[in-house]
Amino acid sequence: MGLTSSLRFHRQNNKTFLGIFMILVLSCIPGRTNLCSNHSVSTPKELPSSNPSDIRSSLVSLDLEGYISFDDVHNVAKDFGNRYQLPPLAILHPRSVFDISSMMKHIVHLGSTSNLTVAARGHGHSLQGQALAHQGVVIKMESLRSPDIRIYKGKQPYVDVSGGEIWINILRETLKYGLSPKSWTDYLHLTVGGTLSNAGISGQAFKHGPQINNVYQLEIVTGKGEVVTCSEKRNSELFFSVLGGLGQFGIITRARISLEPAPHMVKWIRVLYSDFSAFSRDQEYLISKEKTFDYVEGFVIINRTDLLNNWRSSFSPNDSTQASRFKSDGKTLYCLEVVKYFNPEEASSMDQETGKLLSELNYIPSTLFSSEVPYIEFLDRVHIAERKLRAKGLWEVPHPWLNLLIPKSSIYQFATEVFNNILTSNNNGPILIYPVNQSKWKKHTSLITPNEDIFYLVAFLPSAVPNSSGKNDLEYLLKQNQRVMNFCAAANLNVKQYLPHYETQKEWKSHFGKRWETFAQRKQAYDPLAILAPGQRIFQKTTGKLSPIQLAKSKATGSPQRYHYASILPKPRTV
């Protein structure tokens, strides 16, 4: 596909030409629909030069309900990965969907005269600069929290929320009605738009699919500035493109999320295995059953001293004497973590159900620990750990995380090499591992997964300790990640990255496989100038190649278009 580079747009002062230009621009950018404002989109009479001060002036001239700032850009120049420093030119604080649409249409109108790109930023929890827009515009999506969270009861209850709302607020509000979303991430202080642009996977995904599986409707601002309402039956291509689409096709401004009755309590259970085959077999057994736990995850523990004694602060052992005799030093262990939801009046039957399920498993008997906690406390468990790390100054540090999706057929070979040879400890962060059943997932989203019904999420979640050396050093952890990836490639394990990050077109094409052409075609349809989500490093904005008038001409003549891919993007500057 490609953008023809032979045509170049030259600015002219002739008023007649400007009139024709405006007609063509407006004809190739459909008008907005379902906006939360009655304002019309203001368009500059002249295109500003590429000079940053002229670009700033053009942004200031926009008629917005919110506002644009230029002074605090360093606050959004980093993300949770904390490895890159890429300040934008400006920050948009939108008060309405109209503000986002106006900004997008303005940048489309500028065409090849500017380098402006746009990144929608929620809580900034991307890992490798995906939510950054170097010298572009960052949209602070948390400013877009109006109208309020709206909950609808009935046979199929749902909640309407802003794309900038965070999941913990949705949980708190829906619980007032005895309801809750079905599928979660492990950390709830993330925005709706952020998780739906990736997938949103946690221990409920085997039963309900990821969060993108539980969306009825979306409102999207596309890369052209169009505001589109979409669902499985209405504008379905855009709907499925955006879900798991890495922010490439549009900005999620509203979402309608499926709900279910919420429990009051959970029984939270942990058990240990020393044999990976037994561990993975039991995990797969649990996710295959109709009547099973409501949450199934697991994690790897390598050479951890006094492990079970550390659990006692939150969990109670089934057999305290036997638990005290268990030694974890020097061992590679696998923890199965499961949860059963219940209400107080169901406690007795819940105990019977969990007892029966546990009796069918092959864990080490002395390692059974459990706890009963409120539903919201369990779901918000990572935030409790966050507060402790913040107090120690260990939250805002580099996070060289690696998230992989591994086919069932490859998981044993992966575990044998990685957990026994490549890794010697995991004291600097957890390693999650659990299977999901893909047969219950929607098939048409942009999310890329292995081509097997059952695959495992394996997440390496280390933190690089500041001013450290050895195994806690950032460079060491990055090299360790690369060793894992090199092994996967050499062994041909057919692994896919979750929250992917690649540097070259070849790598992105390999990631998408046979779906690459569809992905690129949808990019052309919804964001033809490649304005959105530059930090993903998939496409580069077509600066100096095509303006809207040339784009319209190329469509009219059927001229081929060419995108510029990640292979020619400049390397981000490290912090």
Swiss-Prot record:
Tissues showing expression: Expressed in shoot apexes, lateral shoot meristems, growing tissues of young flowers, and weakly at the root-hypocotyl junction.
Domain FAD-binding PCMH-type: 84-262
Annotated compartments: Vacuole
Reactions it catalyzes: N(6)-dimethylallyladenine + A + H2O = 3-methyl-2-butenal + adenine + AH2
PROSITE patterns: FAD_PCMH, OX2_COVAL_FAD
SUPFAM superfamilies found in the cross-reference section: FAD-binding/transporter-associated domain-like, FAD-linked oxidases, C-terminal domain
Enzyme Commission identifier(s): 1.5.99.12
Residues carrying sugar: 14, 38, 115, 303, 318, 437, 467
Top-level EC class as recorded in UniProt: oxidoreductase
The protein's required cofactors: FAD
Signal peptide: 1-31
UniProt record, GO biological process: cytokinin catabolic process; meristem development
GO MF terms held by the record: cytokinin dehydrogenase activity; FAD binding
A GO CC term attached to the entry: vacuole
InterPro entries cross-referenced by the UniProt entry: Cytok_DH_C_sf, Cytokinin_DH_FAD/cytokin-bd, FAD-bd_PCMH, FAD-bd_PCMH-like_sf, FAD-bd_PCMH_sub1, FAD-bd_PCMH_sub2, FAD-linked_Oxase-like_C, FAD-linked_Oxidoreductases_BP
Record function comment: Catalyzes the oxidation of cytokinins, a family of N(6)-substituted adenine derivatives that are plant hormones, where the substituent is an isopentenyl group. Catalyzes in vitro the oxidation of various types of cytokinin nucleotides that are known as direct products of cytokinin biosynthesis. Promotes adventitious root initiation downstream of MYC2-dependent jasmonate signaling. Cytokinin degraded by CKX1 is required for cell division in the female gametophyte by modulating the expression of cell cycle genes.
Name of protein: Cytokinin dehydrogenase 1
Species this chain originates from: Arabidopsis thaliana
Lineage: Eukaryota, Viridiplantae, Streptophyta, Embryophyta, Tracheophyta
